């Protein structure tokens, strides 16, 4: 009996010790995560209105870090990272970054497609318009839902470089403030085709430096010094990655994607593969294509969320997938300006 009691006490003692160790470890982990959150806040200049908001955001941050680390522990072609969206739930991210961004077209008027007869077998295996000086540095749209303007401007910057030899950073804010009499509504969303229509009617755009980005809607400023123009625009045949390849081989192309998934929210690098939606809500730019070291074919894309997102602001998504709409719907509504 005495031995049995001694054994019971020993077991209870071990259990209490284990519980204490686990509790201490959890406290230590929480303290380390809190310190990480503080460093993240300092990095991104995040300030909360009170302690309650900070505590709530810390819990969201902690859950997102757990998701990122769990995903990265799996077998994937790409990986995620803790970025500027780490204290946002996915619902908040969708509302802030994608729900007010690209507005899918309800009726697309048929246009010509000048690359229809291009021999796809004669196209280069790899294209990267950055190496040709046709891509300006990564920009950041902030909390304004005007991805459509950044996409249209980036495509225009590309064709202007290819037609004139000059790479000019053009003004997204001019579109945000002045292109408001149709589908495009500044920070509330728009679409690239309508942006191209406005640019044509407006006689072009001025420079970024002459009409700086403000990340907010403002009154249209009268500017008469447009420095670059386009003659028209064309839509790439929908749901056709081969046609999109023909276009991208010749110039940067505006595309729309479903950017609301958590893997898109925290994308850090590699070739994005797997399932994703096709509810188009975000405008970006296809600036090339290629093949990864493991043989996965990809599209190279420029985003407008700053350099801390993705591969220094850029993204690679799997190319030529079985779904004709393309990865995240990128082949559904591509278009490009003409010069």
Curated annotation (Swiss-Prot):
EC number, UniProt record: 3.4.22.-
Record: active site: 147, 282, 303
A GO biological-process term: response to gibberellin
Annotated InterPro entries: Papain-like_cys_pep_sf, Pept_asp_AS, Pept_cys_AS, Pept_his_AS, Peptidase_C1A, Peptidase_C1A_C, Peptidase_C1A_papain-like, Prot_inhib_I29
Gene Ontology molecular function, alphabetical: cysteine-type endopeptidase activity
Chief location of this protein within or outside the cell: other
Disulfide bonds: 144-187, 178-220, 276-328
Gene Ontology CC: extracellular space; lysosome; senescence-associated vacuole
PANTHER family for the chain: CYSTEINE PROTEASE FAMILY C1-RELATED
Protein name listed in UniProt: Senescence-specific cysteine protease SAG39
Organism of origin: Oryza sativa subsp. japonica (Rice)
Taxonomic lineage from the root: Eukaryota, Viridiplantae, Streptophyta, Embryophyta, Tracheophyta
Gene: SAG39
């Amino acid at each position: 009996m005495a031995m049995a009691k001694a054994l019971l006490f020993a077991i209870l003692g071990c259990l209490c010790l284990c519980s204490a160790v686990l509790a201490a470890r959890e406290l230590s982990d929480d303290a380390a995560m809190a310190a990480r959150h503080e460093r993240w806040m300092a990095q991104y200049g995040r300030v909360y209105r009170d302690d309650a908001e900070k505590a709530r955001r810390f819990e969201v941050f902690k859950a997102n870090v757990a998701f990122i680390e769990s995903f990265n522990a799996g077998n994937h072609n790409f990986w995620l990272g803790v970025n500027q969206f780490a204290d946002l739930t996915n619902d908040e991210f969708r509302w802030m970054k994608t729900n007010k961004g690209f507005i899918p077209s309800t009726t697309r008027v048929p246009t010509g497609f000048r690359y229809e007869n291009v021999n796809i077998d004669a196209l280069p295996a790899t294209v990267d318009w950055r190496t040709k000086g046709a891509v300006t540095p990564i920009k950041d749209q902030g909390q304004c839902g005007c991805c459509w303007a950044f996409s249209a401007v980036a495509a225009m910057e590309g064709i202007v470089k290819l037609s004139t030899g000059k790479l000019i950073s053009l003004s997204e804010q001019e579109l945000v403030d002045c292109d408001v009499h149709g589908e495009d509504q500044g920070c509330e969303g728009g679409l690239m085709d309508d942006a191209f229509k406005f640019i044509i009617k407006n006689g072009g755009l001025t420079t970024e430096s002459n009409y700086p980005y403000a990340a907010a809607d403002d009154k249209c400023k009268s500017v008469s010094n447009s420095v670059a123009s386009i003659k028209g625009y064309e839509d790439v045949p929908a749901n056709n990655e081969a046609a999109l390849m023909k276009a991208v081989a010749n110039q940067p192309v505006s595309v729309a994607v479903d950017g609301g998934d958590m893997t898109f929210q925290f994308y850090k690098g590699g070739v994005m593969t797997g399932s994703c939606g096709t509810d188009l809500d975000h405008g970006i730019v296809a600036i090339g294509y290629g093949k990864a070291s493991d043989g996965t074919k990809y599209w190279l894309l420029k985003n407008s969320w700053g350099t801390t997102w993705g591969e220094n602001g850029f993204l690679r998504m799997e190319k030529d997938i079985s779904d004709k709409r393309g990865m995240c719907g990128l082949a559904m509504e591509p278009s490009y300006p003409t010069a």
